[in-house]
Structure formats: structure tokens, C-alpha cells
């Protein structure tokens, strides 16, 4: 019987933690198709998170001090886990009952398997299903070696769904660790994971990802850290994939420019947009940094 290690990091997670844990522990096929190992690492929560873990009889580790993000806890758990396959869960991800079973069903095809998901905005009550379509009735897509790596490297909006909560990967890749300088960025980890690897995507939504209006991606400090660390992450591949890295640089700058456009800092928006790919869309953004931005923000999606 295969063993699945599930890594869950927590910090002040009391609102949804019981539902998250139950969704993991109540997976179809548990004890029949696979054995489940749940590893929880808490980052010095100050709410009732630890009490909930104790009441649910969940063994957990905890960091000596708050590290400012989930990555240190993920690395601790990666070093402790003993499963043949590994999943990483966020404390606001609710797994559907068939998640592991469906991922395992195609795990013989590649060492990395992902799926689609449902994005639920708690503040607006809107839900968006993010699932790739299969051209046939197999219900999954196969990606050649480096196909997904290159789409992630170039910041392409098309290709395999690789949000962290969707990934099942073989334990032979557990040596790939997360950055701990900022403690919350996973772009470089995804690049390292998919480098020189084939992968498979199950064309179904297998979990619910809950977010709210105060999305971390809109925090300026997070954006600045993500910007510089993303540039550092892609530079590793410059000798091997120079044109793709240049494309990535342009898109990273474009994203930063649109972020500042969205929050109304037009001077910085122009600075980064001028470093991006100069195309009609970019020119229109640049022009409307002087006049017309309110109309653009009202009727068009700018960022995220």
C-alpha cells in the first residue's frame, strides 16, 4: 500500500482548521488504497490553532519563533515525511473527498501530478473553477519533460495548473526545499520541482481554495520581495534558456507595473512598465497613468 505524506503549515488558522483537517483525513481510499501521514507544523500561532490540533488529536511540530511564512515549516516537514508521495496543503484549502485517489490513479505516468481547483472569494462570495480541458476522454493531460518548467519560467498564463495545493509529487524530489529568506515565496520551488521532469494534470477540480479581499498578493512588501526573488530565481537558468529568461524579466516587470497601476502609484507603474514588453497594451497603460486610469480600473482586470 502506498503511503501519502500531507504537509500542512498553520498560523492563526482557527477559522477553518477543523474543516481543513477533516477534508484531509476523510479522503476516499484511505486505509484501502493508501496510507495517510499528516505532518502539521505551526508557526507560533496566537489564537486557538494549537487547541484545535490537540482536540483533533493531530500530532504537530512548532517553530521556535514566528518565521513570517509557511516555508520554514514546509521544509521541516519535508525532512520528516516518510511517504512515497507528498502533498502540500494550505490552511485554507478544503480537499474534495476524491483528491488523493484521482491524483494517485495517474501517478504511474510521471513523478508530478496536479489538478484543477475552485477559487472561492470569501468576501465577495464569488467562485471560479480553474480546470484545464482534456482533448479526449482520458480526463488528464500529459506534459513532456520541461514543458511545464518552461511555461512557468516564462510566466506564461497557459499550461499546467501548478498552484501549490494541487501538486502530488514523488518522494525522490523531497530534497527540493523552499526559500526561507522571505518565508512565503514558492516560485523558485516550482521551477526546481518541474525542471527536467514530465508531469500529468488531472482535468478536474479537486479542492476548494479560499481567499478573501485582503489577498497577500496585494501587499506591497510581499510584491517587492516577490519581484526581486523572482528575478533571482530565473537568473539561474540564463545560460541554458536566455530568451525565456528575458521573456520572464519582461513579464515580471509588467506585472509589477500593473500592480502599482492598480494601487495608484503611477510613477512606479511607469518605471516598471517601461522595463516590460512594449506592446499596444503596455502603451495604453502608460498613457492612462496620466489620465483615464479610473475608467480602466473600473472596466478591466488589471492585476491578479
Language-model features: where?
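Short, well-formed alpha-helical segments that are part of the catalytic scaffolds
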Residues: 13-28
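A conserved acidic beta->alpha catalytic loop
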Residues: 23, 42-51, 67, 90
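Acidic donor-binding/catalytic loop of UDP-sugar-dependent glycosyltransferases
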Residues: 48, 93-106
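Glycine-rich, basic loop-to-helix element that forms the pyrophosphate-binding segment
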Residues: 64-81
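Short aromatic/hydrophobic "clamp" motif used to bind/position activated sugar donors
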Residues: 86
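Conserved donor NDP-sugar-binding/catalytic core segment of glycosyltransferases
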Residues: 100-133
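Conserved nucleotide-sugar donor-binding catalytic segment
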Residues: 139-222
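Catalytic core of nucleotide-sugar-dependent glycosyltransferases
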Residues: 205, 209-212, 218-244, 262-276
